[in-house]
């Protein structure tokens, strides 16, 4: 299918049979296509330096207590086992200095680093307030550490999710999405 605009032919897509499926295309004075993507900066380049992220939700601002509570409720509603882990700022991100390697291969843990577990996994936990009180206790004991909540599925024997519940006050790694782009 081709569209003729300003005496120029633009090939759209060969498989389109419905006119409604064809995107609106026009050519500006300089001869470039005007599409929705070109009108806004849809295709952005992310800053490759100091743009570290942790697992689920790491692209968002730090979660509030209410948002964490909703996530805990979701974890418990699915009968998953919550577990708290913490790590010092210099050990939180994967790197050659803090990864466990066995010869030329890395360990079998998902991201090659181990965080210290806070107590034991909360097997049989049915009340979200128990998890929230453990988060508060861990934060009080280690205020300058990263703390994440992970959950495990006992049936599939896998880690289902993991997300930060506390960033140290001294952390400078989080950047707003607008600041991550070039």
UniProtKB/Swiss-Prot annotation:
Gene3D superfamilies: Ribulose bisphosphate carboxylase, small subunit (3.30.190.10)
GO biological process: photorespiration; reductive pentose-phosphate cycle
Chief location bin: plastid
InterPro entries: RuBisCO_ssu (IPR024681), RuBisCO_ssu_dom (IPR000894), RuBisCO_ssu_sf (IPR036385)
Pfam family, one: RuBisCO_small
Domain of life: Eukaryota
Alphabetized UniProt keyword annotations: Calvin cycle, Carbon dioxide fixation, Chloroplast, Photorespiration, Photosynthesis, Plastid, Transit peptide
Keyword Chloroplast: yes
Stretch forming the transit peptide: 1-41
CDD domains documented for this protein: RuBisCO_small (cd03527)
Subcellular location: Plastid, Chloroplast
SMART domains (UniProt xref): RuBisCO_small (SM00961)
Residues spanning the signal sequence: none
UniProt keyword Chloroplast, yes or no: yes
An example molecular function term from Gene Ontology annotations: ribulose-bisphosphate carboxylase activity
An annotated GO cellular component: chloroplast
Function: RuBisCO catalyzes two reactions: the carboxylation of D-ribulose 1,5-bisphosphate, the primary event in carbon dioxide fixation, as well as the oxidative fragmentation of the pentose substrate. Both reactions occur simultaneously and in competition at the same active site. Although the small subunit is not catalytic it is essential for maximal activity.
Additional information: The basic functional RuBisCO is composed of a large chain homodimer in a 'head-to-tail' conformation. In form I RuBisCO this homodimer is arranged in a barrel-like tetramer with the small subunits forming a tetrameric 'cap' on each end of the 'barrel'.
PANTHER family (alphabetical): RIBULOSE BISPHOSPHATE CARBOXYLASE SMALL CHAIN 1, CHLOROPLASTIC, RIBULOSE BISPHOSPHATE CARBOXYLASE SMALL SUBUNIT, CHLOROPLASTIC 1
HAMAP family attached to this UniProt entry: RuBisCO_S_bact (MF_00859)
Protein family per UniProt: Belongs to the RuBisCO small chain family.
Assembly with partners or alone: Heterohexadecamer of 8 large and 8 small subunits.
Protein name as it appears in the record: Ribulose bisphosphate carboxylase small subunit, chloroplastic 4
Source organism of the structure: Acetabularia peniculus
Classification of source organism: Eukaryota, Viridiplantae, Chlorophyta, Ulvophyceae, TCBD clade
